[in-house]
């Protein structure tokens, strides 16, 4: 009985304290809980940091994936060449090559522009899509007997075929076309869809290269894909119709944007035997990082689905390739170019043909150093 009374007292005391606690809490609760916005700022900051870390991780993974996406077969040179097909398909698809409605090319106009003591010069229009023509200059040396090697010579940004052929003076080409025919090379210089500021071309309202590129990308191609088609198809037509061209010895070179087109056209076009891109070469990894830096306002054209410069060289391999850049080129960083050249050289080294790749530097700026280019072509196209 005594123990029961004690237990009852304890229960009563417990409920008394509980009632007092709840009463006090009820008295102290505000009508509405409030706090300053600044008190929750650490949470918002943490949310942003989490998203940034997530994006950084995905970016690094995408960069690594892109840098390692080209894996040809190194068992033998033949196996290597055979393994390039799917990569060329992917590269062509990235640029939208061939473009919609591409056709087998045909010459529309072939006109003599002039001649001098070394060559005869022709202007050529070749229809490559109905209503769309590849235009270029074809230079035929007068001292050839039988067949001669052909050099596809690509002008740079804001340029024209007349400049690289030296019909008028543009010093950074160093009279390339004229010097080539003096050495017995045929020259085919296709034109890109560009206006030339130094030629004082008039601006044509509504006709803009960048606008064309945006429109073509919506339609399954790009200005680059269209122009690669122009280069390849027009060269095919010349080869088929001009017996003076040695079809086993076709090379390609270009300056600046012409260097870009030299790399990627040769990567896609197996009949080009040797390539010498000049004044357009940079670190692909740095380019991919730039792609993710949307605050710059401009992004790399390569993106994660494309192929960097060293990978384009990998698709040129096992054919000979010389990449040229000037130590005083203000547009392309020499340190980045050296990094990229090392990556490119590994394709040749793994196949035991490292002598077929050359990273050629000179003391000039954003321009051709033609002696080295002719030395390279003399070695591989003769």
List where the protein language model places each region:
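Non-catalytic accessory segments flanking enzyme active sites
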Residues: 59-139
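Cap/lid segment of the alpha/beta-hydrolase catalytic domain
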Residues: 146-241, 247, 284-290
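Short beta-strand/loop motif that positions the catalytic acidic residue
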Residues: 323-325
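C-terminal catalytic histidine-bearing segment of alpha/beta-hydrolase fold enzymes
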Residues: 342-343, 348-382
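Alpha/beta-hydrolase fold nucleophile elbow
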Residues: 244-256
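Glycine-rich nucleophile elbow surrounding the catalytic serine of serine-hydrolase chemistry
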Residues: 254-264
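Mobile cap/lid helix-loop segments that gate and shape the active-site cleft of serine hydrolases
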Residues: 214-218, 233, 272-313, 318, ...
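Bacterial Sec-dependent N-terminal signal peptides
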Residues: 1-32, 42
């Amino acid at each position: 009985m005594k123990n029961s009374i004690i237990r009852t007292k304890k229960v009563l005391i417990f409920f008394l304290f509980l009632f007092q606690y709840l009463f006090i809490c009820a008295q102290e609760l505000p009508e509405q809980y409030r706090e300053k916005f600044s008190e929750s700022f650490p949470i918002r900051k943490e949310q942003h940091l989490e998203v940034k870390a997530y994006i950084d991780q995905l970016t690094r993974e995408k960069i690594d994936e892109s840098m390692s996406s080209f894996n040809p077969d190194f068992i033998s040179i033949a196996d290597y060449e055979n393994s390039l097909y799917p990569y060329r398909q992917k590269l062509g698809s990235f640029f939208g090559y061939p473009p919609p409605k591409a056709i087998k090319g045909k010459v529309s106009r072939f006109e003599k522009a002039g001649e001098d003591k070394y060559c005869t010069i022709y202007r050529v229009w070749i229809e490559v899509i109905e209503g769309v023509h590849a235009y270029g200059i074809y230079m035929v040396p007068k001292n050839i007997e039988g067949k001669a090697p052909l050099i596809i010579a690509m002008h740079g940004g804001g340029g024209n075929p007349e400049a690289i052929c030296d019909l008028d003076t543009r010093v950074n080409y160093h009279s390339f076309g004229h010097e080539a025919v003096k050495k017995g090379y045929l020259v085919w210089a296709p034109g890109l869809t560009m206006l030339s500021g130094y030629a004082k071309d008039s601006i044509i309202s509504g006709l803009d290269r960048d606008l064309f590129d945006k429109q073509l990308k919506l339609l399954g191609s790009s200005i680059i894909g269209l122009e690669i088609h122009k280069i390849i198809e027009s060269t095919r037509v010349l080869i088929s119709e001009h017996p003076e061209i040695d079809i086993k010895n076709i090379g390609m070179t270009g300056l600046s944007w012409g260097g870009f087109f030299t790399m990627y056209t040769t990567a896609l076009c197996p009949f080009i035997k040797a390539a010498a891109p000049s004044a357009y070469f940079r670190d692909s990894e740095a380019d991919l990082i730039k792609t993710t830096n949307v605050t710059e306002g401009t992004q790399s054209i390569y993106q994660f689905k494309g192929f960097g410069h060293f990978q384009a060289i990998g698709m040129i391999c096992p054919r000979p390739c010389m990449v040229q850049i000037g130590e005083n080129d203000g547009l392309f960083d020499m340190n980045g170019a050296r990094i990229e050249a090392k990556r490119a050289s590994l394709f040749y080294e793994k196949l035991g043909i490292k002598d077929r790749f050359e990273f050629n530097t000179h003391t000039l700026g954003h321009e051709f150093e033609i002696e080295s280019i002719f030395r390279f072509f003399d070695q591989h196209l003769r």
